[in-house]
Structure formats: structure tokens, C-alpha cells
Amino acid sequence: MRFCSLALLLSTAVLTTGEQPGPSAEGGVLLASGWRLRPAGKQVPLSTLPMSAVVSPDGKYVLVLNGGIAPPSISVLDAATASEIGRTPVADAWLGLTFSPKGDRVYVSGGSEAAIFEFTFSRGALTPARTFPTVTKEKPTPRDFIGDVAFDPAGRLLYAAELFRDSIAVINPQTGMVIERFPTGRRPYRILFHPDGKSFFVSSWADGAVYHHETTKGSLIGKIRLGAHPTDMAWLPGVPPGDEKPNWVARLFVAGANTNDVYVAGLTAENDLTLVETINVSMTPWQPAGMTPSALALSADSKRLYIACSDANAVAVADVSELHTRALGFIPTGRYPTAVRVLRDQRVVVLNGAAGTASFIDPPDSDQLEAYSQTVLDNSPYRDKLLEDAGTGPGGPIPSRPDDPSSITHVIYILEEGGLPDEASAPNHHKLAREFVSLDNFHALGGPGAEGQWWATAAIAPDYVVKMGPNSQRLRREGHDFGEGEPAAGPPAGYLWSNAALAGLSLRNYGFFVANRPPEQTADGTQVAYALDPILNRVTCPRYRGFDPAYPDLERARAFLAELAGFEKTGQMPQLIVMRLPNGGADHDSALGLVVEGVAKSRFWPGAAIFVAGSAVEEGQRAPALVVSPFARRGVADASMYNTASMLRTMELILGLRPMTTFDAGARQMTSVFQGAPDTRPYAAEKPGPR
């Protein structure tokens, strides 16, 4: 197996910072994450979360599936003019989009509708034709969800990924009936046929593997394990010219969305799959996970591979014309590219999922690609040197190097889920901001949905959360399973508590990733049935109830204070405490006040720091945040631009932890919040509401 890296192409540039998210005087747009957008090409507005695209057989049109917060739709783009010429609504749509071999019909996955929608297509116009239900029940369940769709090469049968049933449904397009089902890996993402039609490949989002199935019976020919979250695939037949003669006859490129890698599997004449190469798309040699390669496209001559790197807002370019892949560079895109396609004239079309746009980009020559690559690097605040020296400077409690000690020995991280509170309903929030530091320019990453919680605990939202979140948020699919046992939802390096456990730190969990007992089974005071993350099994407070809007936060605070009293008796408190206070209003504010007061009056206060962050705020807007500690500055307003990744990185440095992703690694540390000499005056909570 060979390893190819794009990081070695790029030189170091000066880190730049800005003061407010939005258009920047330095060019482009500054994001709340501290990254910048300077997309190449022409930007065409679409709807929300454009996530897949297909070029018509005649090359004149590009169809785009929009599956975000707005009502789902299919956009038709004119390739010649690079403009949207039509948009057709659908009941639901998620990833699957394909033309019939003749190009006169289009098939769209119906997502939570558990159906496939058929349209006729003529001269750029879509007309609804038929609906192919994949279940017989009147109302589909959350498990009945259609993802990718693909025709066999002969155009006779349509194959559909049943995402939460871990199966492939085979539909006869003449009758619209399901004629067969095949089991496959967990969370089948993409279906790709072998050109001979005798077999097909399925990327398993949850298993980190690609499954190779025989076409007629669906029997498993083979399986190859790759990296986390394999998503898109691209097929390249033949062996490149050269003296080396490999034992494979074709290559299968597979994007690993929870890594910085694209995997290259060689297929032998005997149908064996072997990992022959890994294409690393990192911008620098030591960059942590966070590139999120999630979509692939080959150029018309099959010499270039384009790789959509979603979280890096870039497309990586690699030369695959030889036996060993050669990295060429990057192209800057709009925010969160989800798909890439190449037109007949070699222009590159990129869908920008978070921006809701399509970029039409002329094929860059070597000079232009070099300039584009430097732009991509300049757009990121991350640099490898930050892993060994965060640059926090001397005299404060935040170490600059991973192994340096801190004056702070206990970190308490409290995640809220409300917006900026008013003073009448939140006197403790406002009093804490007045007595300690008022963070006037703090931003939550990821927005108010599930993404915000992932950014606040894992320094990234996995591609599963990004792509499934809108469907659940708009209740097209009932319920949600983000992290609560969902095998495809895990982030690249786990969560803050995973990081701490790996480093051997003592840990206590209050309310994260737990299954609650039914209220009628809590007479003994036990609120938690079990932890949903194995790491949390032995460190979770059983009397601290998880998310349940009907349960008061004040009761949660009292459960914590009861354990704090036990810590006082033993003289031992965990080095990291993670706590979820999910409610809002006066109850929540009183609970926070009691927690802070309890810690501030305890023996642990001289070495404690309490970090409070709100996650349920639109990204780019100010979010509630507090830092309460003897080492926090007193009575000041801080206008430094910080975000949830900044808070995570600051806690990591205090605790001696490595960063989880490129986003906390490159985040601005909250050095201006702290002072070198401690002020141990305690905090007195405002009186809580009645019990």
C-alpha cells in the first residue's frame, strides 16, 4: 500500500484573525470558526443543503438534489450558462438522484417518504410521473428511509439503499414494484455498479467498509475494511502504463468522511479487493482530522480525481493517471462542499451544502492551481506548530505546550441549550457576566440543531449529523438518533470525555449521552437507565437525569451538589466534569447559580474553572458563554472573537489533552479571559425559584 499526501505541496502562511463573522476587509467572508471563505468560480444560488448532483447524458444540464431545512426540491442547472432554470418540489429527497440510461426520466430517493419519485425530463423540464413506494404500510416508520438510487448498467432494474434497514431494495421500473431485497452493511450510503453489471459495491457509512455484492441474488462476494465513514466511490478501470504490473485490473476510490483520507482499493480479476493506496488530503503533514473528504469525481479523461473536502471548504485535486497517485493541490469552494461533477468542457461543478450554492469553476492550469492551493491554506487558521506550542504565552494558567502543568486542576464544562437570556429570567447569568468576564463576541458553531451539540463536545459535526440533521429537524423523519446509539454518528476522535479518558484523567458525567428511566421507575432516585457511550458507563451520575424538558434543571443541580458534598468528604474531585443543563428560563438559571455557588464555596475552588457554553444559537450570532474561576478576570468585557472550539481548546490545554480535530487545534485560545494571580472570592447565587 502506498501513501500519497497533499500536505507537502503547501507552504506556511501567516495566521490572520478578524473581529466579527461576515465580509472581511481582507477579502472573502470570515466564519465564526475563524476560517475564511474565498470560493473560486461563479456562484449560483440554490436551496438549502444541495447534497448530490448528476449530469444529464447529453451534458447540457446538471440536476441537483436539495435536502436541507427548506422544503426539498430538485434544481435544474443549464450547464452552458451556469444558471438555475428550474426548481421542482418533492415531498422529501435525500442523496439518491439518477437519470435513466436514455436520459428521458429522472429518479429521486424519497428519504423519509420510503419511496422513489419518477419524473419525465425533456429540454430541462421535470414533470412528476410516478411514485414507487418501498413499503406497504400506510405510514412509513423512521427506519423506512431511502438513500442512494442507481440503475444497473443495462438499465433494467433500479437499486435503492434502505439506509436504516441496512439493505438494498431492487425495483422494477416498469411496474414500480420491489422485487427483491438484499442485506448489506450498516447504513448503506452509495451504490456503484461494476461496468459489467454482474456485481455492485456498497459503501457502509457505519461499518467503515465497502461490500461487494453479486447482482442477481445479492450474495456477498467480498468486503474490504477501510477508514471511518466511507461515503462516495469512483471507479477507474484498467492499469496505468508503466513497468510495474500490479495484480489488480481496476481501482475503486472511496472517500473516508471521518478521516483525511481517500482509500484506493484494487480489484483483481478474481474479484478480490485489496487496499493499494491511501490518498491523504490534509493541508499540512500533521493536521488532525477535519478535512472530511465526502464526494468524488473523475475528469472526463479519467486522469484527475476531484475530492470534495467538506469541512475544509475545498476540493482536492489528484493525478491518478499513473500507478501511484500524485497530489496536485486544492481549489477553494463555498461552504461545506457536498458533491463535485465534471462537465464535458472540463469545468468543475461543486455543490456547497452549507452555502446553498453551486460553484462553476474553469479547469485550473498548474499556476492557477498553485494560487488556489495557497488560498485554501490561507483560509484556515490551523498550523502544525500549534500542536506543540499553542502560543498562549507565560504567566497565565493556560499552558502553551501539551505537557506543561496548569494552576487549574479541575475543569467543569456545562453545556446549555438556550439562547441569550434576558436579565429578568436569568439573574445568575447576568451576575456572573458582571462579576467575572462578559464574553461579548462568543459564537456557537453548528447552529441550533444537532450540529451545535457536536461542535460543542467533539469540535466537529460528523457528516452523518450534517446530512441527517435537517430531515429530523423539520420532522420529515420522526425522532432523532444523533449519537444515541447511532453507529454512523460518531465523530473522528470521539468527544471531550473520550479525549480525557484516553489520557487517563478522572471524569464524571452529568446528563450527556444517557437513556433515562421512565418517571414511574425513579422512586429510588435513580434517573438513568444506562449510558449510551461505553466510555461513560462507569463515570455517569445515576441520579442526574438526561435530556427531558419536563424535568427541572434545579433537580439536576441538586443531584450534582449531593455528589459534590461527597467529593468534599474524600478530598477528591474529578479532573473533568461534563454537565448538561438542557432547559431554559428561570429554572435553568437558578440551577446554574446553585452549581457555581456550590463549587465556589468548596475546597476545590482555588484550582477550579467552570466553562459554560450555549449551543442552540444560529451560527454567526452571539451565543451565551461564561468562564468562572479564581483565575478568570473580574468585571471586564472581552470582545475577542471566540467560539465553542476556542473553549474546547482552552480546556484541553489546561488538562494536557491533544486536540480532537483541526478546528479545536486551530482555534484561538481564550487567553484574554484569564489572569495569572487567582482571586478566590466566592460567588453567591441569586435565590432560586420555588421547588
For each feature predicted by the language model, list its residue ranges.
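Predominantly soluble domains enriched in secretory-pathway, periplasmic, or organellar proteins
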Residues: 13-397, 404
